[in-house]
Design a protein with these regions (language model features):
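A sensor for short, sequence-defined functional sites
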Residues: 1-181
Length: 181
């Protein structure tokens, strides 16, 4: 988002939201301390939005995908385009860069709804990549947390299992969430 004029940043964020749903509306955005200097340190952006009708409604239940895992900024997540269906690799592989991806989302539930099931927790560590993630209910909110560390840009074939396990664990948090009344 920092490649354009600062006056266009909000429009760029709205464009990202509209890639998820044409009903999305940006309420507010906080770009953090020094967003223009994004190469000096990790950036943190916080934005609030609403999407009327985003959840699919059934009888006494709703189904939806976490926003941060539903086509939001996918163009910069090159690791999602690496085919992790392969069980083994005979040759090294590359990603665009090493990276630390931290995704946190808090979803306000309608009155009377609860997360179906017990939530989810997963982690994976290796010399190539680490992952930790959780999905839980906290009062009337569903809280999603993910931290994916891809430690290299150029990987050896022997790094494949660690990379694959971490990325697949990350992807698994993009499954639909069911809440019930």
């Amino acid at each position: 988002f920092t490649t354009g004029w600062q006056s266009q940043w909000q429009a760029a964020l709205e464009s990202q939201l509209l890639a998820v749903s044409p009903k999305a509306r940006l309420i507010s955005v906080d770009y953090g301390k020094d967003p223009k200097n994004y190469q000096a340190a990790p950036i943190k952006m916080t934005f609030r939005y609403e999407i009327p009708g985003y959840a699919l409604s059934g009888e006494r239940e709703m189904l939806f995908k976490p926003m941060v895992m539903n086509n939001l900024y996918n163009q910069v997540k090159s690791y999602l385009r690496i085919n992790t269906d392969l069980e083994e690799r005979r040759y090294g592989f590359k990603d665009a860069c090493s990276r630390l991806v931290e995704l946190d989302e808090t979803i306000q539930l309608p009155t009377g709804y609860k997360l179906a099931g017990n939530g989810k927790e997963d982690s994976a560590q290796s010399s190539a990549a680490d992952f930790e993630g959780s999905l839980r209910q906290d009062g009337n909110k569903v809280v999603l947390h993910q931290k994916l560390a891809l430690k290299k840009r150029v990987y050896e074939a022997g790094d494949w299992n660690g990379f694959r396990n971490a990325v697949n664990a990350h992807k698994s948090f993009g499954d639909y969430i069911v809440i019930k009344r």
